UniProtKB/Swiss-Prot annotation:
Keywords: Heme, Iron, Metal-binding, Monooxygenase, Oxidoreductase. It holds the Pfam family p450. Its cofactor is heme. Belongs to the cytochrome P450 family. Heme binds at C443. Coiled coil: none annotated. This is Cytochrome P450 77A1. One of its GO terms (molecular function) is iron ion binding. Its EC number is 1.14.-.-. PROSITE patterns: CYTOCHROME_P450.
Amino acid sequence: IFTAFSLLFSLFIFLLTRKPKSKTPNLPPGPPGWPIVGNLFQVAGSGKQFFEYIRDLKPKYGSIFTLKMGSRTMIIVASAELAHEALIQKGQIFASRPRENPTRTIFSCNKFSVNAAVYGPVWRSLRRNMVQNMLSPSRLKEFREFREIAMDKLIERIRVDAKENNDVVWALKNARFAVFYILVAMCFGVEMDNEEMIERVDQMMKDVLIVLDPRIDDFLPILRLFVGYKQRKRVNEVRKRQIETLVPLIEKRRSVVQNPGSDKTAASFSYLDTLFDVKVEGRKSGPTNAELVTLCSEFLNGGTDTTATALEWGIGRLMENPTIQNQLYQEIKTIVGDKKVDENDIEKMPYLNAVVKELLRKHPPTYFTLTHSVTEPVKLAGYDIPMDTNVEFFVHGISHDPNVWSDPEKFDPDRFLSGREDADITGVKEVKMMPFGVGRRICPGLGMATVHVNLMLARMVQEFEWFAYPGNNKVDFSEKLEFTVVMKNPLRAKVKLRI
């Protein structure tokens, strides 16, 4: 019945949307699909997560293949060599973004953000501002005090959580709070002592991510005539609440900038300070409040989920591997003694850095990079890559490729210490793993994220010994996609205070 309905539905859509024939590009191979809807219903009816569907196609179709997802043509790049060719060797051509669906256009203010902007003057201006004026090593040092406060809050929250729940804690919830605390301070220049307010802002940001989830009419736009009214209404409600929540924080910071010394508790600098008068090529005025909301949301969302979920996976792996956890703890004790780990210490900890690198290899934040598109028609592996095609780089597949890694399913930090294997996560010379993307669209917050993960993991291991809950060292590593790749069942852990 499902197949018959799908075929009839495909015919209906075909009659509505058929266009004159044009020269057919030589696309990479892929599974045969139905007219108009392509492989959309095959993916939806497979019972698999999208990354599992892609992973299972790779043995048959190789390292580059095509899916037709309704009106979208999606080209999957699933090898390290082709990722390097596209994003490094042909980086300028592959540096753009495809058209957005209407929901994303609303939240990106028509692509006015670092991640969403097409390759051009808006992207150059916004990215240059973020990298040079906010995420440079010297700027990051200015927020060290906020990171230290957040680390202490993290440890205290875990202590309280453990005391109230027979030594059992939620790993993600506490880590996420600490990361969000840091990013709110960096973005708005305020130290939020009101934990309820922080959690309210955080929940609002989660709601934004939820409404950004793809819908059937994103792939078949003709369906917007018939479905999606309630979802579109929900989108507008969430956007309205997003603006109402963040604009007061924006205006408060604007007042501080315009009246120096008026707020003794305000930070000397914030991301917003760089945005009020940012010069964007081709524009005479600075960003509107709605655009500032978009840029601030990008900063908060981009840094919170990737870091917090990495820590949850990291704690899970240490619980599964007590020997690795103990070796990490001994390194911490050797380097810092009884004092608290700080940012200078983590640079002297090769095993910590190996653990985090292996964590990012085994559990990259997303299955795919943010979608790329090309600025002009180009060939890759002998196939045509047309403009306005969605090019998806299979991050998870690359970091688990047995042709690149020995025993890729094993969590093994020693692979980075023995000289047996190594990888530059920027991918400049060679791509072996790309947790933050590579090339011109590499995540601008890479340096900040690695500092946060290293520091927080070190503090959590220094203060507590972590055990699986319930016991026997069994950890459920089932996963699902919620903007980032998270544990399907949020991690609960039993902790024992060390000091």
